[in-house]
Amino acid sequence: MSTLDRALTHSNNIGIDECEVVVIKKNITTVRITDSEIVEIKQNFDRNYGIRLIHQKKIASIQTTNKEKITGSIDEGLKMTLKLKSKEFWRGLPDKKETTHLEGTFDQKLKDISGSKAADIAQNMINSSENKKIDTITGSLNIVDEDFELCNSKGLNFNHKSTYISGIINAESEQDTLPVSGIGHACGRTLSKFSPEQIGDDAKNMCIGSINPQKINSGKYSIIFEPYSVGEILSFVVASNFNFKTLSEKKSCFSNNFKNKISADEFNLTDDPHIPEGIGTKAIDDEGVKTKKIKLIENGVFKNPIFY
């Protein structure tokens, strides 16, 4: 009996209404760049188990890395539900396996990549960012091979394999009185669509273009954000405020603005889980439900929250 099956059997034996168990296995390759050279190459493997219990509409979540302690974790989770409030919105775990498949979310070449091949990619990032006006280059390359498996007490059982690659270079210059820097960044899901040279070029060009900055007069200006900056804003500033849980608990700055205007008419924001090469692209979410495109803001109006 597998660890996941053992967990579900145990939850049923002790009378839990619903149970969901996931295991995530990751092979992670990291190349670290400091002082314009590769200083570290490491490969790690980790395995994590996640358990969600629903009992009398009370929801408890537990995480462990020890498969031998998974039944004990379920016992502790059941005790936790005694102190929780019921979630009346709860309608049950999914029981239908979705079969939608998206191309470009798994690459066998990334799964099988060696440390030396990863180092070659990182070296290309360094080489393309070198310039006589640049003094120091730092950065990193990360490659992840992920195996996600989910089982629940409704009979749903599915497995999903993914690969990810992400690189970043920070080029610094002290050629002028004021130190400046430039960032190059790219990420994706397949090796063929990933360009280490573009990362280095972007960092180099931004850094060189920032040398000897000029003052401007006070006034109102339009700002054009780099894609990397937009990603940072969306990930760490905007996304959390659209989370359904955050909204329902009145912790979002938009909690009182659902279906109301929150931005300029020209602004639209969409959560698209099917974008090619997207880091968050997936056909099925972590509960086994088919993903779909969601309009968060349409013509300035807050239309939908994010459920995750």
Where are the regions that the model predicts?
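Active-site bordering "gate/hinge" segments
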Residues: 1-282, 286-292, 298-301
